[in-house]
Amino acid sequence: MFDAHSTTILSVRRGNHVAIAGDGQVSLGQTIMKGNARKIRRLYHDQILAGFAGATADAFTLFELFEGKLEAQDGQLLRAAVEMAKEWRTDRSLRRLEAMLIVADRNNTLILSGNGDIVEPENSLAAIGSGGMYALAAARALYHNTEMDALSIAEKSLNIAADICIYTNHNIVSDELKDA
C-alpha cells in the first residue's frame, strides 16, 4: 500500500442523506503545493458521489475508469465496483496506481482500495487518506452523540481532522445526496 499524504475524505450516511467531504490540500513531500483542490465529484448523472485520496493523476485515471464501469452497468454502484476491481487486479498498469476512492449512491457506500479491494463499511461512516482516521473518530463521536445531519457531521469532522493532521487543511469541499 502507499503512503497517502495530502488528503482526507469522509463519507457519512444518516437518515435519508449521504454526504462526502474532503479537504483541499495537495502536498508533495513536506511542501503544500495547493490548498484548494477539489477531491469530491458527482458521477453518473449526479446519482453517485465520489472522493479520492492519493496521487492526483492516478485518482483521475480511477475516476475515468469507474465512470466507464458505471455507464456500462447502468449506474449500478455495486456491479460497477466489482467490474472495476476485476480489471484493477488483472491490468498491470492499474495495479501501480496509488489512489483510493470512496463512492456512495442512495443505498451503498464503498471504499475502493489501492490494491483492487472493495470494502463496504459496516456502519454509516467511511474515511480514507492521511487524516481519515482522525475524521472517522470525530464522525463516530458526533454520529452517536448528536442529532447533526450527515453533511454537518462530515464537515465538522473534517475540520477536526484539519486541526490535527498536517496533511489536511480547512478548505472543505462537501456534497450530499438527499433522500438517499
From Swiss-Prot:
Keyword Ligase belongs to the record: no
Listed EC numbers: 3.4.25.2
This protein's UniProt keywords: Allosteric enzyme, Cytoplasm, Hydrolase, Metal-binding, Protease, Sodium, Stress response, Threonine protease
Active site: 7
GO MF annotations, alphabetized: metal ion binding; threonine-type endopeptidase activity
Catalytically driven reaction(s): ATP-dependent cleavage of peptide bonds with broad specificity
PROSITE patterns: PROTEASOME_BETA_2
BP GO terms, sorted: proteolysis involved in protein catabolic process
Gene Ontology CC, one term: proteasome core complex
Residues at which Na(+) binds: 162, 165, 168
Location relative to the cell: Cytoplasm
SUPFAM superfamilies assigned: N-terminal nucleophile aminohydrolases (Ntn hydrolases)
Pfam families according to UniProt: Proteasome
Top-level EC class: hydrolase
Summary of activators and inhibitors of this protein: Allosterically activated by HslU binding.
Function, as annotated: Protease subunit of a proteasome-like degradation complex believed to be a general protein degrading machinery.
Assembly notes: A double ring-shaped homohexamer of HslV is capped on each side by a ring-shaped HslU homohexamer. The assembly of the HslU/HslV complex is dependent on binding of ATP.
Family to which this protein belongs: Belongs to the peptidase T1B family. HslV subfamily.
Entry-linked HAMAP family: HslV (MF_00248)
Official protein name in the record: ATP-dependent protease subunit HslV
Record organism: Dichelobacter nodosus (strain VCS1703A)
Gene from which this protein is expressed: hslV
